[in-house]
Amino acid sequence: FQAASGNGDSGYGSFSIDAAGNWTYTLDDTNPAVDALNDGDPLSDSFTVYSEDGTPQLITISITGTNDAAIIAGTTSGAVDEDGADAPVTATGSLTASDVDNTANAFQAASGNGDSGYGSFSIDAAGNWTYTLDDTNPAVDALNDGDPLSDSFTVYSEDGTPQLITISITGTNDAAII
């Protein structure tokens, strides 16, 4: 074979071939068309190699897209005070998702209990989340002034990229019952 190197005909990567016919293709993941592929989307690239006598041979490369994880930013923690008269019993935040695979950049709307069971959460498709402390939970109600607990929940972008939200819970002084 005639040793050669260069870019594929579609420009999605580069190739090289040595005189023994061993060839290598390297995909350019930074190419916008390659980076934008959704999971399972196809592309192809090709290049022509030549034998020692000049006979051409077309080599075609099949490229299959994979899921790129979303980049999640925003409020990933919150704080609530147990049973305080002026203290919040909810924490709120907002997240954003940037995902080249899913242009909606949305979240999977969900609601449920926190991982430790001290409260409940909800998130909408726009990434707005709310955590509500359950002041009737025995572990929460038993907190002394300044005692800490934590709860957490996991939310997911449209493509399934997880993001952990952590909630700090602080005990307050409950008035005596007479």
For the regions a language model picked out, list residue spans one by one.
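Extracellular ectodomain surface segments
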Residues: 1-11, 71-117, 177
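Acidic, turn/loop-rich segments in luminal/extracellular domains of secretory-pathway
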Residues: 7-64, 85-86, 95, 114-171
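Proline-centered linker/hinge motifs at extracellular inter-domain junctions
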Residues: 67-72, 127, 173-177
